[in-house]
């Protein structure tokens, strides 16, 4: 909109406001005039009672059948009547005389003021409607332009333009991903010195595809490249090109690249590109709008309409669904797998996000990085942010270890369910279930290290074991996979041995154990069937029915062998199982230091000391005389009620167990507390 258009629009709005004010003033003047205003029935009543002394009339329009009259009554009142029919005023009798001949009917003389006022009022009304029409038309025009822009993609393309300054976001703001940074530095050099590569006859990669799990920093890397090079950065998502109208997506692609060409050299970043670049031919009935959009994107990247100086960076979590035409050299020349950070990268990410947070000296980011294998950069940032929120909630000045531990639990499992309270039987069942997992993790070779055990309900879990691998590896051996299956089955084995009954708490345990066993048989070649892969789905398999029976038998064999091994280990370490379950019932949460102390000494020194200090005043008050009585006071009432025994015949049958669906992973073995 030009300067004169803005002035003209403001003038129209000013006239409209002025007209509204004048019309309002006119109506107020007419309302407070000294003349009374009555309806037609009042006029008839006055005429029939012979109370009219004089009538003065004004015709509304020429040759009109109605007129406005001013009636003067016999008592001196002056009354205005509007739109009175002429026949009613000048009605005649059969003898030719007026029906109401007791009053005089004369034309009302108009003075100059009234003429001017009447003309002004009519002009003002017309001006009001004219300005209102202009205002309404301008509004409709703006709405139409917005609809047209949304369907044509022009407005969306403009809104996607973001200028990234190299001083605002660079590689120093992205922790980890050193190899990807080194590879993408070539793009930065091209954007800064394009003639250098043109002189050598080299063609810079036109597109870079970043793929990997969510939260690994794909978008941040693209922004950092633009920031390092100091070039315009056009950001869009795949859904921006998706529209109900066929052809709109292709139009938006053209508009985006047209604007990028004007700003070249520049970077066009398309996030979640799988929304627009899926494999063609999957839609029944032929081509559709999404395929037209993909075709236009292919042409813009490497076709007759290819743009020079425009580098496309795309990100996706599903590279396997992308069309092969867009992955070929000349379009996306470079494919970078942005993996989950290793321990070194996790420490760097934690240091970056902890730079603006107040951490206590007891917190070691190196140790925290070792405790978070499999965490993405987004999860690490969320952990520190959650810890900061917890510290602020309790009005603390620093973030301590307890805040970090609680934040990890919230990220992995969820918040604490304080409203859920176990009864004694449920609590014992959950304690022994989690203790069974822990015993397997402690005693079996190649198992993951137990870091934490808790029976506090959290999220959908009634309790869980946090286990970490002994070291980060890129492969899993057969012994390690069998150890994982055995660990998953430890909870069910402990229930069976201690209660002579089982609960549905091992639902997820069996699910994950079966998945691992199936992969070992059908994908990894780790069974008696040999090094062969078998694939299929619910509707079709690439193996015969007899072979499917053999696969099922091999899976059952692996599960059965691991179950027997878990039962043997727990029976051989019954005392360790009872001790862990006992302290879980008392403390509810055990960390790695507590677990190591139980394995080494059979007790937790700090807890026993705390119990002695708590029971000491009770012993003095009761004045116990014998050593046996003093020893008995060291056991709390909770221990009396929940004393653990190995006599299965004396265990109570657990008829109303919680639905402890375990949410397990290589890092977490959890017991779901939701009821079925």
From Swiss-Prot:
PROSITE patterns (alphabetical): AAA
TM helices/strands, residue ranges: 13-33, 116-136
Membrane-side (Cytoplasmic) residue stretches: 1-12, 137-676
MF term (GO), any: zinc ion binding
InterPro entries on file: AAA+_ATPase, AAA_lid_3, ATPase_AAA_core, ATPase_AAA_CS, FtsH, P-loop_NTPase, Peptidase_M41, Peptidase_M41-like
Biological processes annotated in GO: protein catabolic process; proteolysis
Entry keyword set: ATP-binding, Cell membrane, Hydrolase, Membrane, Metal-binding, Metalloprotease, Nucleotide-binding, Protease, Transmembrane, Transmembrane helix, Zinc
Residues reported in the UniProt entry to bind ATP: 212-219
Membrane topology type: Multi-pass membrane protein
Domain of life: Bacteria
UniProt binding sites for Zn(2+): 433, 437, 509
CDD domains (alphabetical): RecA-like_FtsH
Enzyme class (EC, first level): hydrolase
Annotated EC: 3.4.24.-
UniProt function note: Acts as a processive, ATP-dependent zinc metallopeptidase for both cytoplasmic and membrane proteins. Plays a role in the quality control of integral membrane proteins.
NCBIfam families: FtsH_fam
Subunit note: Homohexamer.
Family: In the central section; belongs to the AAA ATPase family. In the C-terminal section; belongs to the peptidase M41 family.
PANTHER family in alphabetical order: ATP-DEPENDENT ZINC METALLOPROTEASE YME1L1 (PTHR23076:SF97), METALLOPROTEASE M41 FTSH (PTHR23076)
Record protein name field: ATP-dependent zinc metalloprotease FtsH
């Amino acid at each position: 909109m030009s300067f004169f258009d803005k002035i003209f629009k403001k003038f129209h709005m000013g006239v409209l406001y002025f007209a509204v004010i004048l019309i309002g003033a006119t109506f107020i003047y007419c309302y407070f005039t000294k003349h009374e205003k009555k309806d037609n029935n009042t006029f008839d009543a006055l005429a029939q009672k012979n109370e009219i002394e004089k009538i003065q009339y004004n015709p509304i329009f020429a040759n009109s059948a109605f007129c406005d009259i001013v009636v003067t009554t016999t008592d001196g009142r002056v009354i205005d009547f509007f739109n009175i029919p002429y026949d009613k005023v000048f009605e005649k009798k059969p003898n030719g005389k007026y029906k109401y001949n007791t009053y005089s009917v004369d034309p009302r003389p108009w003075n100059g003021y009234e003429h001017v006022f009447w003309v002004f009022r009519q002009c003002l009304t017309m001006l009001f409607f004219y300005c209102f029409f202009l205002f309404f038309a301008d509004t409709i025009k703006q709405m139409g332009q917005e609809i047209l822009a949304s369907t044509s993609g022009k407005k969306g393309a403009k809104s996607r333009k973001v200028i990234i300054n190299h001083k605002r976001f660079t590689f120093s703001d992205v922790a980890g991903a050193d190899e990807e940074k080194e590879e993408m530095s070539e793009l930065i050099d091209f954007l800064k010195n394009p003639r250098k590569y043109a002189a050598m006859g080299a063609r810079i990669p036109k597109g870079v595809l970043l793929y990997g799990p969510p939260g690994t920093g794909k978008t941040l890397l693209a922004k950092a490249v633009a920031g390092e090079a100091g070039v315009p950065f056009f950001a869009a998502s795949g859904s921006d090109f998706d529209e109900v109208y066929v052809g709109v997506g292709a139009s938006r692609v053209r508009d985006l690249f047209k604007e990028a060409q004007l700003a070249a050299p520049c970077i066009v970043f398309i996030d979640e590109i799988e929304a627009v670049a899926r494999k063609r031919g999957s839609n029944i009935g032929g081509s559709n709008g999404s395929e037209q959009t993909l075709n236009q994107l292919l042409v813009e990247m490497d076709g007759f309409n290819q743009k020079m100086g425009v580098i496309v960076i795309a990100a996706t979590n599903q590279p396997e669904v992308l069309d092969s035409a867009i992955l070929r050299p000349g379009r996306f020349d470079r494919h970078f797998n942005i993996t989950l950070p290793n321990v070194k990268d996790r420490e760097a990410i934690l240091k970056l996000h902890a730079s603006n947070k107040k951490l206590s000296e007891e917190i070691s980011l190196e140790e925290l990085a070792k405790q978070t294998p499999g965490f993405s950069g987004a999860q690490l940032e969320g952990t520190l942010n959650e810890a900061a929120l917890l510290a602020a909630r309790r009005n603390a000045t620093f973030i301590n270890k307890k805040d970090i531990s609680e934040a990890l639990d919230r990220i992995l499992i969820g918040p604490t369910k304080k409203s859920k309270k176990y009864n004694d039987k449920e609590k014992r069942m959950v304690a022994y279930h989690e203790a069974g997992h822990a015993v397997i993790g402690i005693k079996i070779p190649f198992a993951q290290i137990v870091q934490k055990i808790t029976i506090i309900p959290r999220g959908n879990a009634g309790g869980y074991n946090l286990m970490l691998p002994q070291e980060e590896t890129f492969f899993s051996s057969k012994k390690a996979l069998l150890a994982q299956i055995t660990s998953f089955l430890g909870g069910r084995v402990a229930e069976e041995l201690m209660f002579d009954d089982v609960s549905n708490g091992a639902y997820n345990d069996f699910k994950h154990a079966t998945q691992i066993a199936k992969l070992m048989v059908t994908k990894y070649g780790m069974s008696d069937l040999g090094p062969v892969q078998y694939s299929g789905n619910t509707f079709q398999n690439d193996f015969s029915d007899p072979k499917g029976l053999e696969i099922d038998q091999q899976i059952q064999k692996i599960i059965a062998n691991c179950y027997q091994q878990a039962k043997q280990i727990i029976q051989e370490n019954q005392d360790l199982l009872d001790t862990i379950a006992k302290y879980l019932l008392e403390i509810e949460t055990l960390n790695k230091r507590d677990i190591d102390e139980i394995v080494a000494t059979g007790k937790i020194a700090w807890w026993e000391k705390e119990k002695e200090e708590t029971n000491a005043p009770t012993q003095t008050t009761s004045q116990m005389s014998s050593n046996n009585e003093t020893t008995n006071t060291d056991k709390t009432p909770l221990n009396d009620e929940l004393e653990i025994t190995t006599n299965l015949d004396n265990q109570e049958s657990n008829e109303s167990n919680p639905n402890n669906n375990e949410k397990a992973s290589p890092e977490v073995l959890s017991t779901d507390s939701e009821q079925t």
